[in-house]
Design a protein with these regions (language model features):
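Non-catalytic, glycine-rich low-complexity segments
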Residues: 169, 181-234, 238-239, 310, ...
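Short, solvent-exposed loop/linker segments at the N-terminal edge
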Residues: 223-229, 327-338
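Aromatic sugar-binding surface patches on proteins
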Residues: 261-282
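Substrate-binding/catalytic cleft of secreted carbohydrate-active enzymes
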Residues: 1-196, 213-223
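Beta-strand-rich structural segments
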Residues: 235-237, 336-353
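Beta-strand-rich binding/interaction modules
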Residues: 230-256, 293-298, 354
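Short, aromatic- and glycine-rich surface loops/edge beta-strands on solvent-exposed regions
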Residues: 285-302, 342
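Edge beta-strands of extracellular beta-sandwich domains
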Residues: 302-314
Length: 354
């Protein structure tokens, strides 16, 4: 219950101890709580303070499956069963070069990659309205960038005592201490998805299950088919095979997922040199705009189980409105509210992004 601040006055530690007790009492019966971080986050505190915080958690939650953690380089780390660090499996990534195979490790937060802590420029921080190229870079950065950095693929290549990590952060939000919002979310502040959302969605199992949330196979084309779009087409999918078609009855490209035991379940798929705006222009001049498309088909056991089709947005002619309620209806109690999303679209409903 604190961040980057320590005071040597005894009263400060006593108040923190009280906060820790109240924190555990408040949340100890929540089924989603797996691990406690009772220490002051990113703070240079004394050794005896760390020992006391661990003891307080154990007192308030005296059960065998009570786990507490702190940073692997912090004072008093020897008192904690879980240590926070970044993967260091290859000796290059930012992590603990002296990782002990007898200790459980966890990456408390990963993903951010700022140039400095004043400017806050980062390939992870991308506003949704910046368009497809920045969003593609963000998704690639989170998945498996060309440079050495903690990413989803790296977390899948750790020894088994490194049990995972948490992305920073799920949604864009205001922070208060910087003029820019934090743009590192998989969705924007209005919970509208960026490409990174679909990249992570592709990591789920393709098996269809009876659950309260969406399951099963998926495929998504991260390409807007604009005059500024890349010739390379990026696709996210959890299927065994993806078939991409450019133009109706046109060129077909095929991707087969590699059979590997290491790394992220569904790597980012790139179909090189597929899209050509000049072909779009040629077909449009022939009044054949309906034949200009990208069609992705996800296959499992040779059968198509998921599809996604993208068309270029033409002349803007209407507004689309939809309720973003995730299937939960409004309750007329005077306090409920819901998000209504508005979009500019052509006559066929293709949203005009640029």
């Amino acid at each position: 219950p604190g961040w980057q601040f320590w005071n040597d006055a005894p009263e400060f530690a006593r108040r923190v101890y009280s906060d820790i007790r109240n924190l555990v009492r408040r949340d100890r019966n929540h089924a989603c709580v797996w691990l406690w971080e009772p220490i002051l986050n990113e703070t240079w505190y004394p050794d005896d303070f760390a020992k006391k915080t661990r003891e307080l958690v154990d007192q308030e939650y005296p059960y065998p499956y009570c786990y507490s953690g702190c940073d692997s380089g912090a004072r008093g780390k020897e008192y904690f069963p879980v240590l926070f660090t970044h993967p260091s499996f290859d000796g290059k990534a930012w992590g603990d070069p002296n990782a002990d195979p007898k200790i459980t490790y966890f990456t408390r937060e990963w993903g951010d990659n700022v140039d400095d802590w004043s400017s806050h420029n980062s390939p992870s921080r991308v506003a949704r309205n910046w368009g497809e190229q920045p969003m593609l870079i963000q998704a690639r950065h989170y998945a498996n960038p060309t440079y050495t950095y903690t990413c989803y693929d790296a977390l899948y290549r750790t020894p088994r005592q490194h049990v995972g990590g948490c992305l920073w952060h799920s949604f864009d939000h205001q922070r208060g201490y910087h003029p820019d919002p934090f743009y590192g979310g998989l969705m924007d502040v209005f919970r509208q998805p960026k490409y990174s959302y679909y990249m992570f969605k592709a990591q789920r199992s393709p098996e269809k299950q009876e659950r309260l949330f969406e399951t099963g196979p998926m495929v998504y084309i991260a390409h807007e088919m604009t005059p500024f779009s890349s010739k390379d087409v990026t696709v996210y999918s959890n299927c065994e095979e993806v078939r991409l078609t450019f133009m109706r009855d046109g060129k077909v490209s095929t991707y087969s997922k590699p059979l590997t035991e290491a790394g992220m379940p569904s790597p980012v798929i790139t179909f090189p040199d597929v899209y050509d705006f000049q072909m779009d222009k040629a077909m449009s001049r022939k009044k054949k705009q309906e034949d200009v498309l990208l069609l992705a088909e996800g296959l499992i056991d040779g059968k198509v189980v998921a599809t996604h089709e993208v068309h270029p947005a033409r002349r803007p002619e209407k507004l689309l409105l939809w309720v973003d309620n995730e299937g939960v209806n409004l309750k007329a109690d005077g306090s409920d509210f819901v998000t209504v999303v508005a979009a500019v679209a052509d006559k066929n409903g293709n949203i005009k992004r640029l």
